[in-house]
């Protein structure tokens, strides 16, 4: 049985949906896993807490599943040190995190909407996965930045990957991924519309004016976002049944190291009913 440590900031529906997607498959008997704890970097007792109601819904879900909830409030942890030396604070917070989860051994950590940067020692001690909204070797940054970079490059494909959490943000080895075309039916007319706009404006001007409302941007985001939940669950399934593992922070299977990340595109599309 795979012991899956769960780390989440619990700030909205996305955090709940990720946990529910994995637990639904566990409870149906489809995933041979245990989640020994859920760690959150908020206690929900903080005075300044704009996501209190959303986080309480997340906490209620965790408790409803009977999973131990472990919290270390980042806002209340050594606040003076955080103001004067953030790097030193991150090291100390990492020590507190590791101590807090030490009663709950786990095989693989899942950063599921976890919004703090993990310290170096925690990354070294545990194998942990993070979701990044791009293909292996693709753009870095937020999902917004990724999509606009793809548009600027006139890319043919987009996707999402699960990568190892390392000291360098978004630089760990890609472990699993799914991809999809951003050309063809449903896309070609949007690229053509962009080309017409580029006859009178630069891409930067279009980006500034439309940003999150650009039709091509929205289509790429829609098709990428709907793949994130099944990518997470299919990745967990691959680890649970032994098809995938991490050795020395690199992807491997039963026979040894893989040449690259494990391609879950077909399984993700099947889960979505995409032909």
List the model feature ranges, each with a label.
Residues 1-275:
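One-carbon transfer enzymes
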């Amino acid at each position: 049985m795979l012991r899956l440590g769960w780390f989440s900031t619990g700030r909205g529906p996305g955090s709940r949906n990720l946990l529910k997607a994995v637990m639904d498959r566990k409870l149906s008997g489809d995933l041979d896993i245990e989640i020994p704890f859920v760690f959150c970097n908020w206690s929900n007792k903080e005075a300044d807490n704009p996501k209190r109601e959303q986080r309480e819904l997340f906490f209620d879900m965790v408790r409803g599943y009977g999973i131990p909830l472990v919290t270390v409030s980042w806002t209340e942890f050594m606040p003076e040190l955080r103001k004067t030396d953030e790097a030193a604070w991150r090291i100390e917070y990492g020590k507190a995190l590791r101590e807090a989860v030490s009663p709950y051994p786990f095989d693989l950590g899942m950063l599921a909407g976890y919004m703090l940067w993990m310290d170096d020692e925690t990354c070294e001690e545990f194998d942990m996965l993070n979701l990044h909204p791009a293909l292996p070797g693709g753009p870095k940054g937020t999902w917004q930045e990724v999509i606009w970079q793809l548009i600027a490059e006139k890319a043919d494909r987009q996707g999402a990957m699960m990568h190892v959490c390392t000291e360098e943000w978004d630089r760990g080895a890609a472990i699993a991924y799914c991809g999809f075309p951003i050309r063809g039916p449903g896309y070609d007319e949007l690229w053509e519309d962009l080309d017409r706009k580029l006859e009178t404006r630069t891409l930067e001007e279009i980006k500034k004016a439309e940003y999150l409302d650009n039709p091509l941007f929205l289509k790429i985001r829609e098709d990428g976002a709907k793949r994130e939940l099944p990518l997470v669950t299919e990745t967990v399934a691959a680890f649970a049944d032994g098809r995938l593992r991490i050795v020395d922070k690199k992807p491997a299977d039963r026979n040894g190291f893989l040449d690259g990340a494990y391609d879950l595109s077909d399984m993700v599309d099947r889960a979505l009913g995409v032909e």
